Amino acid sequence: MAFKQLFAAISLALSLSAANAAAVIEKRATCSNGKTVGDASSCAWFDVLDDIQQNLFHGGQCGAEAHESIRLVFHDSIAISPAMEAQGKFGGGGADGSIMIFDDIETAFHPNIGLDEIVKLQKPFVQKHGCTPGDFIAFAGAVALSNCPGAPQMNFFTGRAPATQAAPDGLVPEPFHTVDQIINRVNDAGEFDELELVWMLSAHSVAAVNDVDPTVQGLPFDSTPGIFDSQFFVETQLRGTAFPGSGGNQGEVESPLPGEIRIQSDHTIARDSRTACEWQSFVNNQSKLVDDFQFIFLALTQLGQDPNAMTDCSDVIPQSKPIPGNLPFSFFPAGKTIKDVEQACAETPFPTLTTLPGPETSVQRIPPPPGA
């Protein structure tokens, strides 16, 4: 596992232990809006929060702008390679905002195609509020997740200096990469292992694709793209039957539902012996999904940074709403049953799920951000 990130997270948690509770209380500050925070510098982020909730996320919606903001966090953060540094080459700065500062370079990289639109939408907020691009990308991603029902309470730390050069190409995994390639890449970036790779991919629960199939945009990865739940982990294990658009695109394989896309890397990671059981473990297990993603998101947003030199401003991030009560945590979409599951975990049986009533599920597209 990513022991460096785990150690940092534990160290931060210990700083808030009961032994230091009195000191923590003394340090809390009250902002002009009446909210209390652990550090007075966090107060300025409430203005940023109000602004982006209204003017970027359209009143706090878990829509296309939220999905792309979450994607931007990963593509900025994962662009770091200690292996390249060991060879005397620049290996990228991780979560440093380079994808926004050098957007003319980095958004032209193949895995970053389409991110130029969310970068253009976010840039004016960075300029208006005077925050660093790295901090803003992490903040917008955390707020975006809070807009998706079921998401964990996200952590947010400030203190990322602006990037001084663009990250090199080739550091962001592609949909057509093999499982070995992707595991090796995340291990190089942050000593993440194959289980933590699965945790990262939980973000696909609230995601859609605009650029894999050139004939259609806004294709979700699962049937509940506006909810942070485990449906992504259910539906990626269902047998693919058709393409939602033209088909035959690099990095795309058949999906089980009309209107839903499946990328090759998700398909293979869900079925690889090293990752299949961890993948299945999220089915009908919302608490594990929430805990593991909360941890991995923080670890990603601190890649290339010194966590001990950062300021915890997590108080500013809203809590997400619960999953709607009329839906189980995991289910088979209408028209699907256990017979459609391609069982890959040899250790435990696939969980027992109910099938939603009604005609076969057809997944609605998500309109992409303006200009995409």
Swiss-Prot record:
Residues 350-361 have a biased composition (Low complexity). Ca(2+) 2 binds at S205, D222, T224, I227, D229. SUPFAM superfamilies: Heme-dependent peroxidases. Its EC number is 1.11.1.14. Depolymerization of lignin. Catalyzes the C(alpha)-C(beta) cleavage of the propyl side chains of lignin. The active site is at H75 (proton acceptor). GO terms for biological process: cellular response to oxidative stress; hydrogen peroxide catabolic process; lignin catabolic process; response to reactive oxygen species. Residues 350-372 are annotated as: Disordered. Ca(2+) 1 binds at D76, G94, D96, S98. It comes from Phanerodontia chrysosporium. The record marks R71 as: Transition state stabilizer. One of its GO terms (molecular function) is diarylpropane peroxidase activity. Disulfide bonds join C31-C43, C62-C148, C277-C345. This is Ligninase LG3. Heme b binds at H204. Pathway: Secondary metabolite metabolism; lignin degradation. InterPro entries: Ccp1-like, Haem_peroxidase, Haem_peroxidase_sf, Ligninase, Ligninase_C, Peroxidases_AS, Peroxidases_heam-ligand_BS. Binds 1 heme b (iron(II)-protoporphyrin IX) group per subunit. Binds 2 calcium ions per subunit.
